[in-house]
Amino acid sequence: MSGCNCGSSCNCGDQCKCNKRSGLSYVEAGETTETVVLGVGPTKIHFEGAEMSVAAEDGGCKCGSSCTCDPCNCK
């Protein structure tokens, strides 16, 4: 995946947008706006304060063991 690299604090780079919790992407939400698209497929949404986590799609950048990105394979 181009542009996918490991950043600081054991997470993938800015374009990967993943933290140590594999399979989750984090998007900072400055406002409480929600858009729902129906009929596309199942989506898991969890609101926690101003942070929203959405399950990543298959093939997305996930953080693996030893602070490496998988499938980015950054070391």
UniProtKB/Swiss-Prot annotation:
GO MF term set: metal ion binding
Entry keyword set: Metal-binding, Metal-thiolate cluster
Source species, domain of life: Eukaryota
Cross-referenced InterPro entries: Metalthion_15p
Family matches, as Pfam families: Metallothio_2
Function: Metallothioneins have a high content of cysteine residues that bind various heavy metals.
Family: Belongs to the metallothionein superfamily. Type 15 family.
Protein name (Swiss-Prot/TrEMBL): Metallothionein-like protein 1
Species of the source: Cicer arietinum (Chickpea)
